[in-house]
Curated annotation (Swiss-Prot):
InterPro entries: PEP_COase, PEP_COase_bac/pln-type, PEP_COase_Lys_AS, PEPCASE_His_AS, Pyrv/PenolPyrv_kinase-like_dom. Belongs to the PEPCase type 1 family. Keywords: Carbon dioxide fixation, Lyase, Magnesium. Disulfide bonds: none annotated. One of its GO terms (biological process) is oxaloacetate metabolic process. Its EC number is 4.1.1.31. Pfam families: PEPcase (PF00311). Its cofactor is Mg(2+). This is Phosphoenolpyruvate carboxylase. GO terms for cellular component: cytosol. It catalyses: oxaloacetate + phosphate = phosphoenolpyruvate + hydrogencarbonate. The gene is ppc.
Amino acid sequence: MTQEYSTLRNNISMLGRFLGETINDAQGEDILELIENIRKLSRNSRAGDDKARQALLDTLGSISNENIIPVARAFSQFLNLTNIAEQYQTISREHSLAQSSSQSLSELFKRLKEQNASVEEVHKTVEKLLIELVLTAHPTETTRRSLIHKHIEINKCLSKLEHHDLTEKERNIIERLLLRLIAEAWHTNEIRTVRPTPFDEAKWGFAMLENSLWQAVPEFLRQLNETAREFLGYDLPVGLKPVRISSWMGGDRDGNPFVTAQITKKVLYFARWKAADLFLQDISKLADELSMMKCSDEFRDKYGEHLEPYRFVVKNLRNQLTATLAYFDDHLSNRTPRVSESEIILEDNQLWEPLYDCYQSLIQYGMRIIANGSLLNILHRISCFGVTLSQMDIRQESTRHTDAIAEITRYIGLGDYAQWTEDDKQAFLIRELSSRRPLIPQNWTPSPETQEILDTCKVIAQQKQGVIACYVISMARNASDVLAVHLLLKEAGVPYHIPVVPLFETLEDLDAAEKVMTQLFNVGWYRGVINNRQMVMIGYSDSAKDAGMMAASWAQYRAQEALVNLTEKLGIELTLFHGRGGTIGRGGAPAHAALLSQPPRSLKNGLRVTEQGEMIRFKLGLPTVAVETFDLYASAILEANLLPPPEPKPEWRNIMDELSTISCDIYRGVVRGDKDFVPYFRSATPEQELSKLPLGSRPAKRNPNGGVESLRAIPWIFAWMQNRLMLPAWLGAGASIRQIIEQGKGDIIHKMCENWPFFSTRIGMLEMVFSKSDTWLSQQYDQRLVKKELWYLGENLRKQLEDDIQTVLSLSHQSELMSDLPWIADSIALRNIYTDPLNLLQVELLHRFRENPEQVNPDVEQALMITITGIAAGMRNTG
């Protein structure tokens, strides 16, 4: 690693030393020596020493069941500590001093100034800026909350140690705390013993909001204002809302039978309780601060004559928040509320108005410094979080709505809705939506499945407008899918319009998105209720699983482009909602690059994007890291709108069409076309064993008896990441590029790399995947776990992978992967030394596990789970 990363090197070394000290203390010298020997063999094996490689295999293959857990834990915990050090590096003083990121807001405003950008245009674009992060509980977070808390404290210690003026005594105190935290982590079980409930997942999300985003959002808004003021010459409005937080936790019932209407209601109550708790803490501190006596005449007229007018207002709010806390505490405990709704705070404006009045009065009386202190932070929090802490999305699969309406139509004698043509469905739905009479008979008893759908709609009807952000329909295929949800919401008595969002996920559905939305927009009733606003969700994970990375990404691009053009033509304001994950197979890419690779004008109404599983912690888990993440998102959105990427040339489109067809055929030829593929996949990866790891509340399969097509995209990608073949992220992509180059179109491919962010980002993502893949390790899985007659599949895939790596290197004119990002290459090289033993241990453990699955040694099962979480930590992005 370069000199710039000396702090990172030193921190990793120190954390490793403290971990060794902990292991020696807890397990004894013999275990520590065994671990150290494995580490040295792994390092030498990576350096090309064949004898060391064989010795590594022999050592790990002969390890006793008794010793296997501490060995697995040692390498897993070191990788977690490396992640902490790397996360800290991005926010360290050294990093800040060494480079002002070219992707930051401040650098963007410098470029805008250099290019004489219109102040008016910049002002309009900044005022429209919207970053809406949707937190999801997808089961890719393999680290327990108990450990996450300790990891945050370790990060704080690293921050303190970076101060160069520490005395030896002060340094020793911090290092002792660091050692203790590492020891606490070692003696904490890293594997959950029970699968979290949806309510547990929601509490995890709210804890992250409280511990990180509550501090980060006001700080980011201050930085945004300061940076914009340098360019604009004036402050942004206090009421600006450039950040919004939404959540799927407690609302996403797609394939998760444990998310019920009752769970949704409980999570909504808990969110309001937590918001009241956090605002009460803020308001109590504010009551101490606002001891000023002077206020404006308007303020005095509105709130009365008081010696300390601001305190009077703030104390009233404190009383209301205390009552709010009690009210929702009673609801959560199933007690009759002790206070009435008239005594509590239910809407943002009940908090905003009196506090904004305080703010304006303080400004008017020359107390700007005080107004811009804690009070401004609270106003920013009201704008972003509101009194519900976050908005909730409801998500359900399209056929569940079809089945519910079909049950109704059968009962009332209209026939089976599910069997009707699309035209007949639409005609029926539009007729019922326009009718004033109810469709559902009062005393009807539906099936439990339909009752659950109706109960969910009733919970929505009980909420005030704005609490539910939208209703997302997964696997949306037709205009009737959207109209059906509107009808169910109408029948439940929802008194206002809720955005109903189709999620287009498969290749065919993405290609049909424009046609489906055109049909919807042609429905007069529909145009009348949407108020010329439409949200559409683009699915990244299922489309990549369906067609491969290259074909899926081009389908996503084309769908977005078509929807932008369609809505512009009709005067409809379009928000694109991106369902991305952390991995390449699920649309993951560095945030800035990913956003600048979107079609022109697709971000003009802001960004709505899912933040999933482990990526929430990596990108938002610490206040300073979250501020950096918001800065990158804001800078990319503003750049995409003010300095838009080029429209792709016709010849580039033609090449992408060819790449898409070729890559999809190759991908599906393997995944769907080879009868041996499913048994090979099940043997060569820990896919079946993954279901034993209690990561999230949602089952891994939509249909427990199905094949790959029934497997959720997340475990599909997670499994391939474990055996280092990383297949979903590259299969078909490199081979299609190679075919196009062999057709004599290499010059066009090179121009696309140099001049088109969409294409260059795809190549960069492939390079990152290739640098984390490992054909030798993948071969070990095959040789120990796969029947010989299936070995040909692994051999063919590894040959394709090696050929694809050479193809990508020919585009970058480099001899090594990641040559242009040496510190990432160094980071991967360092991780490999610790991840390789975990992979080889996993092979050994899977072999032992599968030999006698009915009588598995508990130590073997526990160690296997540890290797899964350890490899996830080593790879950084799991699913």
